[in-house]
């Protein structure tokens, strides 16, 4: 471990002890006399990133230099996001060496200037070890460090900011300005609005106050304007209101009401998709909302008591409400539109190290950083899979000592960064330098658990996650105490000495009683116990350099830059992933963690090969040959046939929270079928378990999201044995006859539809038999003579001949929907707002026009009217007195009307979509499950994003909707 060398006293002290001269830095990975760059094989790569919606080139830089072992996606993201200088100029960075040098040399110089190191040799070891860790993707700083450090622009290193607003117009207008400046810099901010008096209180002039909800409109509009002014991602923003604020019900309902507006506007034909032209007219869409609840309120909910809402001016109770009813309204709103989230105030402040300097009122947008108002936090995340030692034969161990040494290295670097960092406001700069908040965390927890044979929702999985977290934070505070001996404790420590030591004791006590599970976590717990003993001993002697040490961030862009399989504390998305290949192209691969887990659990290589092959074909482990049923849970993922339950996510959060200084960025995903009671259970049980904050997201609760097309299974149970026998008989009779072509008459009814898919215009003419369904399709694209037009002509003939030989339309629909290729994207059809290709659009439109409701519902295809009905009633089916005219109602802009025609009665099994090309793992999951992942399209490159904590991350280009 790192040592300190004795020397004369320096700096302000909380106690009368002397400071030491500087840190002695021990080598972890590097070799004396050999630079880390010289131990790596380098190669040149071409980075060309396109927008898959329209084929345009988003970014291009050729000949960049990276280690040969780096994945294509990581190279693309680091080059496009983090290299500085204009492309094509001499100032443009062309090598990862330049990028890493720009950062580590700045950190080394600042460390030397502020007397962190005992000697120049220690400074050099620090530089080399930091370079090695970044080069080999062992950890990563948050994005602002990569953006700014070592460049001529301001050296902003923090991604997370908390602001404050008081009950005055001057303060409110300052809030707008400060928030805007943070957004301009690409970061996010959050604040608590509870100091602003409610709309039920009077102004000094005698009129009624506007209330915080009113002022939220201005801030929301400002954030939306800055986003539309050229940012590559939306402003990351959080607004919080205390549960005892008199305007709390209005706050809870803000997004629910706006979501109803979105539905109405969408049904009227406006473009209300995320990023659509018309969505900007709707309010409150640029922020996450959270309600700050206290124990008094939660106990009132538990006991069914009344709860008082208090005046902001006098503190008196001005209204009493039914606590359970108010809690229900929160759950209903979250069920309907995913907002508000919930934060547990007493739990948060129980773990507050600096209560004498103020309470914790707010958080950053992703809810992992929680501390004093007008402060910031710089983040870094460790790649946990880099510390798993695996001999390839099932023997595994976690490299405890190396992990602790890397934590010490990273904490030292993070603290040094505060010495040279710039901040968006003077108040934030002063407070951050005074309290020196850090946010070390990790990524790839989900991958580590699977690789070691632990189910995410299991005692063993929670024990391993808790042990690693405890060791990380314990080592961080130990290093913080060692830094305090060298350069002094944080300025606010003297005032907060006893509370800080009390919180350290709480962490240590939680570590002492935590359950141990197996041979993997037991050594980690032992090291964690030793680290917490050192924390208490050194903290009592030296104080602490940092008021906070750890958070669990979403690790969106940086997780992809480190080639992590999973972000933050999230489980794996799916068992089969999409991988880009050097030189272009891509392939689908089964997670490397799967065979690791199988070896750990004792399976032989022949069995492993068979199980992996089954997963590659089916996307899940159900009925995998030779796999024991008790091992299925190890391979449970966030999506799929065996997805992790909502409470499984909450239990993992509770297992980690006791050893995190801040909180955990986590959204608990619920299925579309979840009830309001399920939301209440998640919110209530999280409070009981000691979680600090969370949010829920029910699939398809937002109109602006792509709607799920998952087949409903409930109708299958209604099929009787007699009906099944009839079906089998019918099918047998069908296959006994040779196909006979049934040509259409000279005069045949038809309908011509104009359409636009991803900017490509076309016309579809669908002709039908007078009494027996669709018989032919003609497709004409706007550019005659083009390859696309020719292919569409040939495709039309092939489909038409197949229809006339008796191929059921539903077979074509099941095969060709969800097929993805360009052109793709937005359409001008209100029933099919997004299409993954022209073929995808054509067969969705044909299904809506020609297939009966039951058949296309089984294929997951519904009209806009049916989707609206489902949102209102929970069912897609028309009522008994309602005629099945959805095709006519929703296609009113089309001049002609098509008579409903019955299709042949032969029953076929709904087939899965044929294998297609995916661009991201999220899209691959969609193809395997036959559903649309409930996530927005990336604003930069047009691919489907996926959840990362409370945010969304684009696997294709690294863009994120959050602040990490």
Predicted ranges, named:
Residues 1-804, 813, 830-832, 932-935:
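Extended catalytic cores of very large enzyme megasubunits
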Residues 8-15, 708-748, 856-940, 948:
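Acidic, low-complexity intrinsically disordered tails
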Residues 691, 695, 847-855, 949:
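Hydrophobic alpha-helical membrane-spanning segments
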Residues 759, 842, 950:
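Residue-level signature of catalytic and energy-coupling elements of molecular machines
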Residues 775, 782-867, 872-874:
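Phosphate-backbone binding interfaces of nucleic-acid-interacting proteins
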Residues 938-941, 954-957:
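Short cysteine-rich clusters marking metal-coordination/redox-active sites
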Residues 947-951, 964:
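Short Cys/His-rich "knuckle" micro-motifs
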């Amino acid at each position: 471990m790192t040592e300190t060398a004795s020397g004369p006293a320096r700096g302000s002290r909380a106690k009368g002890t002397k400071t030491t001269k500087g840190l002695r830095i021990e080598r972890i990975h590097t070799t004396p006399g050999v630079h880390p760059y010289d131990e790596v094989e380098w190669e040149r790569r071409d980075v060309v990133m396109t927008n898959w919606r329209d084929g345009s080139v988003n970014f291009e830089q050729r000949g960049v230099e990276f280690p040969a072992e780096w994945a294509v996606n990581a190279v693309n993201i680091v080059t496009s996001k983090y290299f500085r200088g204009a492309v094509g100029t001499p100032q443009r960075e062309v090598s990862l060496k330049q990028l890493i040098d720009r950062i580590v040399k700045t950190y080394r110089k600042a460390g030397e200037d502020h007397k962190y190191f005992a000697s120049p040799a220690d400074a050099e070891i620090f530089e080399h070890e930091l370079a090695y860790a970044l080069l080999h993707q062992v950890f990563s700083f948050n994005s602002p460090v990569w953006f700014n450090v070592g460049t001529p622009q301001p050296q902003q290193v923090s991604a997370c900011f908390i602001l404050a607003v008081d009950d005055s117009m001057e303060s409110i207008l300052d809030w707008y300005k400060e928030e805007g400046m943070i957004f301009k810099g690409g970061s996010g901010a959050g604040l608590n609005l509870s100091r602003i008096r409610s709309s039920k209180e009077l102004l000094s002039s005698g009129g009624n106050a506007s209330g915080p909800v009113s002022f939220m409109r201005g801030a929301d509009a400002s954030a939306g304007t800055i986003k539309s002014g050229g940012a590559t991602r939306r402003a990351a923003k959080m607004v919080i209101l205390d549960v005892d604020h008199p305007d709390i019900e209005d706050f809870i309902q803000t997004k629910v009401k706006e979501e109803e507006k979105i539905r109405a506007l969408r049904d009227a034909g406006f473009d209300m998709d995320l990023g659509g032209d018309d969505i900007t007219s709707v309010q409150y869409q640029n922020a996450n909302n959270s309600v700050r609840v206290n124990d008094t309120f939660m106990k009132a909910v538990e006991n069914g008591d009344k709860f008082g809402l208090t005046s902001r001016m006098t503190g008196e109770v001005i209204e009493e409400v039914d606590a359970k009813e108010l809690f229900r309204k929160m759950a209903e709103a979250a069920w309907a539109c995913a907002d508000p989230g919930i934060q547990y105030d007493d739990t948060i402040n129980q773990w507050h190290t600096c209560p004498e300097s103020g309470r914790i009122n707010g958080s950053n947008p992703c809810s992992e950083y929680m501390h004093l108002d007008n402060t910031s936090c710089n983040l870094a995340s460790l790649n946990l899979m880099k510390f798993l030692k695996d001999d390839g034969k099932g023997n595994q161990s976690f490299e405890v000592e190396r992990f602790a040494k890397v934590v010490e290295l990273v904490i030292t670097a993070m603290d040094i960064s505060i010495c040279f960092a710039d901040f968006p406001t003077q108040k934030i700069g002063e407070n951050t330098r005074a309290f020196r908040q850090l946010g070390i965390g990790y990524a790839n927890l989900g991958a580590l658990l699977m690789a070691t044979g632990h189910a995410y929702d299991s005692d063993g999985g929670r024990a391993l996650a808790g042990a690693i977290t405890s060791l990380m934070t314990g080592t961080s505070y130990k290093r913080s105490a060692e830094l305090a001996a060298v350069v002094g404790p944080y300025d606010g420590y003297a005032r907060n000495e006893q509370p800080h030591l009390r919180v350290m004791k709480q962490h240590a006590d939680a570590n002492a009683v935590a359950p141990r599970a197996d041979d993997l976590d037991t050594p980690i717990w032992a090291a964690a116990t030793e680290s917490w003993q050192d924390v208490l001993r050194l903290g009592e002697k030296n104080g602490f350099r940092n008021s906070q040490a750890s958070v669990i961030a979403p690790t969106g862009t940086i997780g992809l830059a480190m080639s992590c399989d999973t972000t933050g504390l999230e489980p794996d998305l799916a068992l089969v992933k999409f991988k880009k290949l050097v030189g272009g192209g891509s392939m689908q691969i089964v997670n490397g963690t799967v065979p690791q887990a199988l070896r750990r659990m004792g399976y032989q290589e022949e069995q492993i090969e068979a199980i992996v092959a089954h997963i590659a074909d089916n996307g899940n482990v159900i009925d995998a040959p030779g796999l024991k049923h008790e091992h299925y849970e190890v391979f449970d993922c966030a999506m799929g046939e065996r997805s992790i339950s909502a409470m499984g996510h909450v239990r993992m959060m509770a297992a980690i929270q006791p050893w995190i200084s801040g909180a955990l960025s986590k959204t608990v995903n619920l299925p579309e079928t979840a009830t309001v009671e399920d939301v209440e259970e998640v919110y209530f049980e999280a409070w009981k378990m000691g979680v600090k904050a969370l949010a829920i997201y029910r699939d398809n609760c937002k109109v602006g999201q792509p709607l799920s097309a998952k087949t409903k299974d409930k109708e299958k149970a209604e099929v009787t044995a007699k009906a099944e026998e009839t079906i089998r008989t019918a099918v047998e009779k069908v296959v006994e006859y040779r196909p006979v072509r049934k040509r259409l008459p000279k005069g045949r009814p038809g309908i011509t539809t104009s359409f636009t898919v991803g900017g490509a215009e076309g016309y579809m003419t669908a002709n039908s038999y007078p009494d027996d369904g669709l018989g032919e399709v003609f497709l004409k694209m706007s550019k005659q003579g083009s390859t696309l037009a020719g292919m569409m002509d040939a495709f039309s003939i092939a489909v038409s001949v197949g229809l006339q030989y008796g191929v059921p339309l539903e077979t074509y629909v099941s095969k060709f929907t969800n097929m993805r290729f360009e052109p793709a994207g937005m359409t001008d059809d209100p029933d099919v707002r997004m299409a993954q290709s022209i073929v995808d659009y054509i067969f969705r439109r044909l299904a809506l026009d020609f297939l009966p409701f039951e058949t296309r519902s089984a294929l997951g295809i519904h009209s806009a009217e049916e989707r609206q009905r489902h949102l209102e009633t929970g069912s897609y089916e028309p009522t008994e007195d309602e005629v099945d005219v959805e095709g006519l109602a929703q296609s009113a802009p089309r001049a002609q009307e098509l008579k409903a025609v019955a299709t042949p009665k032969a029953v076929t099994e709904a087939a899965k979509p044929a294998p297609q090309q995916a661009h991201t793992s999220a899209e691959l999951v969609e193809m395997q499950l036959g559903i649309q992942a409930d996530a927005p399209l990336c604003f930069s490159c047009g691919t489907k994003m996926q959840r990362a904590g409370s945010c969304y991350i684009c696997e294709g280009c690294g863009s994120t909707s959050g602040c990490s």
